[in-house]
Amino acid sequence: MQRNQFLVSSIVGTLVAAAGNTFAMPPDILQPFYLPPAPPLEPGPGGLDIRTWVRSTQTNNQFSCIEAAVAPKTMGPPPHLHKALDEICYVLEGTASVLVGDKIYEVQAGGFHLRPRGLVHTFWNASDKPLRFMDLYFNQNFEEYLEELFHQIYADMAKQNLTPLDPTIAKRMAALDKRFGVTMFPEQRQAIVDKYGLK
């Protein structure tokens, strides 16, 4: 009899504990969040700027996204590739010229474009109107790369009147690229600037 009572107590205890855990939220379960609207982003002093919307820390490193603003006739980054990052661009305003390999895509407002990992790519604004787009990143905290580049390295360059060729700046940028698996091809940039009359 005591054995039966022990078994019943054990089973009931296990079921109660399991039922209690049904409503517990493990730390890796995503929580809902809301992001209110914000005024459109304006290009910064160098003709580009970024603003983070969704952080990778909010999505267990599954997803993040930023808004980018590019002034008219402005070149984006040098051609580059990502070792492990796929990017999706959604254009909010204007037209993004996106180079992947040797093909150029003209992505108008409302259009999407995928830039897969391992392919050399860049973008620019060839028009006389502002360009704004959202960049979506998967399985990498790439918003942190951009925040460090735009809001720390570029900010320090402006304060100290330095260029990317300054040894201190070049070292910081190379370390940042290495940390995030980015390979730059700066020697390919000027030909694009010259061909499309960009800044």
What does each model-identified segment do?
Residues 71-75, 110, 118:
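Tight coil/turn sites that cap or link beta-strands
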